[in-house]
Amino acid sequence: MTGPLLQLTRVTRRFPAGEKDVVVLDDVSLSIDAGEIVAIVGASGSGKSTLMNILGCLDHPSSGSYTVGGRETSELESDELARLRREHFGFIFQRYHLLPHLCAAENVEMPAVYAGSAQAQRRERALALLARLGLSDRASHRPSQLSGGQQQRVSIARALMNGGEVILADEPTGALDSKSGRDVIRVLRELNALGHTVIIVTHDEQVAAHARRIIEISDGRIVGDRLNPHADAADAAPDASGGAQPQRARRLSAGVGRFAEAFRMAWIALVSHRLRTLLTMLGIIIGITSVVSIVAIGEGAKRYMLDEIGSIGTNTINVYPGADWGDSRADAIQTLVAADAAALADQIYIDSATPETSRSLLLRYRNVDVNALVSGVGERFFQVRGMKLAQGIAFGADEVRRQAQVAVIDENTRRKLFGANPNPLGEVILIDNLPCVVIGVTASKKSAFGDMKNLNVWVPYTTASGRLFGQRHLDSITVRVRDGQPSDAAERSLTKLMLQRHGRKDFFTYNMDSVVKTVEKTGQSLTLLLSLIAVISLVVGGIGVMNIMLVSVTERTREIGIRMAVGARQTDIMQQFLVEAVTVCLMGGAIGIVLSFGMSFVFSLFVDQWKMVFSAASIASAFLCSTLIGVVFGFMPARNASRLDPIDALARD
């Protein structure tokens, strides 16, 4: 590289202050070559710290150009800037900016974690750096157990972890006693002698006197830039930079390392606030316990009821043409007619009967065309099927007799044809070009397996036969067995009557077994209802997780700034807080499942008719649900953390 290592050209930095902007740097041009040791001197408020932040890619110019090794920083994305900070810059802060819950060696390792270095290599280099700086016996100590000078040396070691081509020292002696300050300056000079570019930001002329180049700044402008002939060259300490940098691990290993670091930091954060963590998990625990227990109770109740009702008959029977399901001759059999339905309806064991015939036809209303199942039925159809109308009325015997052009539609058809119109009664629709007046809308019936999406229209069977289908025979007959009558006996009598009328067995019957279906549907609906109530507690728990994570982001803003300064990407920060949220939810989910098994034991003490039945699917779903809650409700806090400005984050206490 032939040009300067760092070059600013007419750089200006403004900050908004009310309706006006405050100019902190004004038209600054500056170049620094590799291997220089430079002091930037100025009073408080002169703009020297802002200049250092721009040099270290923690901040960006409002206008002008800044290049690092010939690369224009304004063209770089946030992750590319993080890579520059991680691989080229090392920061030494006046306030040290060490993470209090990590030991000295772990603080030094941090830049290498985000560089993707292998764990063993980064620990070896961290210990070597601390040893060269006289802290080998303090590697396992936390910052609170170190003196100010020792903390600053840890900060220097951290700056060198990834090589530290450029060392940026912001008032490195400002918080130290004179002896510790001299030691820090000595180390910086030794690093410069080893080839590191050292930039010292200070207001102390005595500190600046150790630099071979002094740049003076005042009111955001450079007012002096001179060489210092009185600065002595330092002798390089042979191993002051700690030896070889740790090699970057393979992509997979690097990703695993960063994830492990995120999990470890999440665990430390959770353990350090035990009560808050427990209260955060409480909503998740209650929700998971409720969902798993309710599903287990519902499954146990269903099995018990199915065992109990066993062979109980049902009250609805269908009659179809043919020998059985799939009979290829069924379409050719035309002996099932409306008179059969009338004869069945007259039997003492039958409550009601309805003929049925159906086709898929095109419906049209104004400019809306849809395909629907059009069924021709008798006036007792809705009674037989137990269907209720949400609007209007059903057609009666008179409409059936005179082939009236009237129709009853279901709710799905109403939505498709009429959209936002809540009252389609009296509207005329075309059924295969036959105009029919809508006289009723059936109420929605939800299946235990979900909402039925098909479209249904019912017209008098005489209208269907004479005006739409052009056929006299029926597709089926549905009868409802009178209450109190044995379903199997009714089926036998029905079969006998039909044989007498047809003279041969050209039909078959199907007993709907409605009791079993009703029990299953009721059990599933009840389980669903109670599960939804439990899910509400899960959502509340998730909101609690989000609130606590937002608080955690606020509390750890400075930590986020430190991590960004040493090279953490936005994705690294987001991953850390997402892992923390998911960890909370998974722990809550695990505790909830354990409590569910405990509830099973208590349940068996009070209810002996059936027992709770757990399934692997419900337990796996609980863990999946916990993970999803952690991701969904942890996303916003994690995103907020990743979008923090490094300078603003570092400035917060």
From Swiss-Prot:
Subcellular location, principal: membrane
A single BP term in Gene Ontology: response to antibiotic
Organism: Burkholderia pseudomallei (strain K96243)
Family listed: Belongs to the ABC transporter superfamily. Macrolide exporter (TC 3.A.1.122) family.
Transmembrane stretches, start-end: 278-298, 526-546, 587-607, 616-636
Superkingdom of origin: Bacteria
Membrane topology term: Multi-pass membrane protein
Gene designation: macB
Any one Pfam family match given in the protein's UniProt record, by short name: MacB_PCD
Enzyme Commission code(s) on record: 7.6.2.-
Record's function text: Non-canonical ABC transporter that contains transmembrane domains (TMD), which form a pore in the inner membrane, and an ATP-binding domain (NBD), which is responsible for energy generation. Confers resistance against macrolides.
Compartments where located: Cell inner membrane
tRNA processing found in the keyword field: no
Gene Ontology CC entries for this record: plasma membrane
Gene3D superfamilies to which the protein is assigned, alphabetical: P-loop containing nucleotide triphosphate hydrolases
Protein name, as recorded: Macrolide export ATP-binding/permease protein MacB
Quaternary context: Homodimer.
InterPro entries registered for this protein in UniProt: AAA+_ATPase, ABC3_permease_C, ABC_transporter-like_ATP-bd, ABC_transporter-like_CS, MacB-like_ATP-bd, MacB_PCD, Macrolide_Exporter_MacB, P-loop_NTPase
Alphabetical UniProt keywords: Antibiotic resistance, ATP-binding, Cell inner membrane, Cell membrane, Membrane, Nucleotide-binding, Translocase, Transmembrane, Transmembrane helix, Transport
Gene Ontology MF terms: ATP binding; ATP hydrolysis activity; transmembrane transporter activity
Residues that coordinate or bind ATP: G42, A43, S44, G45, S46, G47, K48, S49
Domain (ABC transporter) ranges: 6-244
EC class (word): translocase
